[in-house]
A protein has these predicted regions:
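Receiver (REC) domain active-site loop signature in two-component systems and cognate sites
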Residues: 54
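C-terminal output helix
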Residues: 105-115
């Protein structure tokens, strides 16, 4: 299974990629929102781990773009971000984000949430 990690922090991308690679997933990485949309459309990931605050397009703009595209509309999304106000959480969930996790985060908890979402999305 393939997972796209979109975060402008290379440290966060490395941490998440290391955890998910150790779980046996193939990992794609994007450093900004526009790259995330492009990779989601071309790379066809099974799940996206997405930061809210990124250059070029923020996480909510990425979610909107992916949900409007039939090729990516059903890809599960985990929002992993420091932006955890009630307004941010409700905004993300309202756009179709399946999980909303605050930073700092537990890589093991992220791993479990990813596994659960992928199991639910499996045919």
């Amino acid at each position: 299974m393939k997972i796209l990690i979109a975060d402008d922090s290379s440290t966060v991308r490395r941490l998440v990629a290391a955890r998910l690679s150790a779980d046996g997933y193939q990992v794609l990485e994007a450093a900004d929102g526009a790259e995330a949309v492009e990779l989601a459309r071309s790379g066809r990931p099974d799940l996206l781990v997405l930061d809210k605050v990124m250059p070029k397009m923020d996480g909510f703009e990425v979610v909107r773009a992916l949900r409007e595209d039939p090729r990516t509309a059903s890809v599960p999304i985990v929002m992993l971000t420091e932006r955890t106000s009630e307004q941010d959480v409700l905004g993300g969930l309202g756009l179709g984000v399946e999980e909303y996790m605050p930073k700092p985060f537990s890589p093991l908890e992220l791993s479990l949430r990813v596994r659960r979402l992928l199991a639910r999305a499996a045919p």
